[in-house]
Amino acid sequence: MHKTISVELNDASINSAVKELQRYAKWVSQKEAELVTRLAQIGATVASIQFSRAIYNGSNDVSVRVDQTGSVAVIYAEGSSVAFIEFGSGAKYGYGHPDAGKHGFGPGTWSDGPEGKGHWDNEKGWWFGSGQHSYGNPPAMAMWKAVQEMTEQITRIAREVFGT
C-alpha cells in the first residue's frame, strides 16, 4: 500500500505526521500478523492432510499444531512416527524426500538399538512390534508439501491482506 504523509515545518504538523506514522506502523503490524496466521493455517492444513493420508504400517500418531506469537508462527508435527512418515523408511520405499539428507534422515539412519540398522535394507522387509511386517513406507513429505503450498500462496494472500 502506498502511503503519503504531508508535513509542514511546524510543531502541529510534525506531531500530526508522527501520529499518522504510528497508526500506519500499527496497521502494518496487524496485517503482518494476519498474513502469518493465514499462511500458517494453510501450512497446518496441508501437513495434517498429508500425514493423515500417509502410507505407514505402524501407528500414525502424528498431530499438527500451530504456535503463533505476533508475526511469528511455527507449525509443529508431533508424534513418535513423524520422521518415519515425513522422510520414509526402508530400502524399498524410503527414498525420495528432497530434504532428507539436509536433516540427517533417510534409509538406514535410525535405529532403536545396536542391531536395528541391520534390517532396513533387507529385501524381504522386516518384522516389528508384535508380528507386524513391513517393507518400509514412502515419504509423505507432509511438512515439505506444506512449505511448497505456503510458498505458492504467499503473493496472493499478501495482496488480499494488504489490499494491493
Where are these regions (language model features)?
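Short, Lys/Arg-rich flexible segments
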Residues: 1-82, 95, 99-164
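His/Glu-rich zincin catalytic helix
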Residues: 86
